[in-house]
Amino acid sequence: MTNRLALSGTVCRAPLRKVSPSGIPHCQFVLEHRSVQEEAGFHRQAWCQMPVIVSGHENQAITHSITVGSRITVQGFISCHKAKNGLSKMVLHAEQIELIDSGD
């Protein structure tokens, strides 16, 4: 089964770093995406806020460069996580992160 997502946007919630009891580092943040997409011959505004989690040692170094306002592209897979309140939310599990040069 295919499960791949690439999403570019701006980090809109500060990264939260934790280490699991088994020693695996995790970094969580929220990515806001805004764009214009073409659908059925018409332009439409596309917008979402996607929770992102980065797990493992491989990508942790780049997460230290990520702050609110950072523009990035994230590639990975999506999965549902159940919150403490019982509601499910879609989460992007990052496998590759690229900082987008702002040109400043």
From Swiss-Prot:
Keywords: DNA replication, DNA-binding, Primosome. GO terms for cellular component: primosome complex. GO terms for biological process: DNA replication, synthesis of primer. It comes from the Bacteria. InterPro entries: NA-bd_OB-fold (IPR012340), Primosome_PriB/ssb (IPR000424), Prisomal_replication_PriB (IPR023646). It holds the Pfam family SSB_1. GO terms for molecular function: single-stranded DNA binding. Residues 1-101 form the SSB domain. Belongs to the PriB family. Homodimer. Interacts with PriA and DnaT. Component of the replication restart primosome. Primosome assembly occurs via a 'hand-off' mechanism. PriA binds to replication forks, subsequently PriB then DnaT bind; DnaT then displaces ssDNA to generate the helicase loading substrate. This is Replication restart protein PriB.
